[in-house]
Design a protein with these regions (language model features):
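Short, glycine-/small-residue-rich phosphate/pyrophosphate-handling segment
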Residues: 149-169
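Internal, active-site/partner-interface "lid" segment
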Residues: 168-178
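A cross-family phosphate/adenosyl-ligand binding-site feature
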Residues: 1-13, 23-107, 118
Length: 178
């Protein structure tokens, strides 16, 4: 499939959730297993903010070791509201043009975007601009259209259930409602 070296960018956007690093690792392992030395992975730092400002780094297989159970995201993330993507603010930066420039400067062939609704709206916008984009659904809200369950959701439910169970026990011990 890859007859010449391809460069794949990965970014995480929005809030962090359980499973981000595991997903990043899984994607990297799958790419290396399938394409070996014919793939290069580029980490976009701090979500779309990094794509706007040109913050990215070349990654190697060692970068993905030891992150399976690590919380957060090794790439960093920032909330960059979708509604502001087309707005040229006082800094006079055309964000869409800046993201396209970084994509081209990094010589990306494809960009994988891990995030929720806003992340996927921006990914769709970039796709409409002619960039090759793949969206990976990530949200503890489990509210992305077309998905049954998003990663991060089950862990959030498990933690919330545990907190409620513990408070229930405490409330019973003190004969009160919490």
């Amino acid at each position: 499939l890859f007859d010449m070296k391809k460069r794949v960018g990965i970014l995480t956007s929005g809030g962090d959730c359980p499973g981000l690093n595991a997903t990043i690792r899984g994607v990297a392992k799958a790419l290396y297993a399938r394409f070996g030395e014919n793939v290069e992975i580029v980490g976009i730092l701090n979500g779309y903010h990094g794509l706007i400002t040109g913050e990215y780094k070349e990654m190697c297989e060692d970068d993905f070791r030891g992150i399976l159970t690590l919380g957060g995201t090794i790439l960093g993330t920032k909330r960059t509201p979708f509604k502001l993507m087309r707005v040229v603010e006082e800094d006079k930066i055309d964000k869409v043009a800046a993201m396209k420039k970084t994509y081209k400067d990094a010589k990306l062939d494809c960009l994988l975007c891990l995030g929720g609704n806003g992340t996927h709206k921006t990914a769709n916008l970039l796709s409409q601009e002619g960039l090759n984009v793949i969206g990976l659904p990530k949200t503890i809200d489990n509210d992305i259209y077309g998905t049954d369950v998003t990663f991060g959701f089950h862990t959030a439910v498990d933690i919330a259930t545990e907190v409620i169970d513990r408070n229930h026990t405490t409330a019973g011990s003190h004969s009160r409602v919490m």
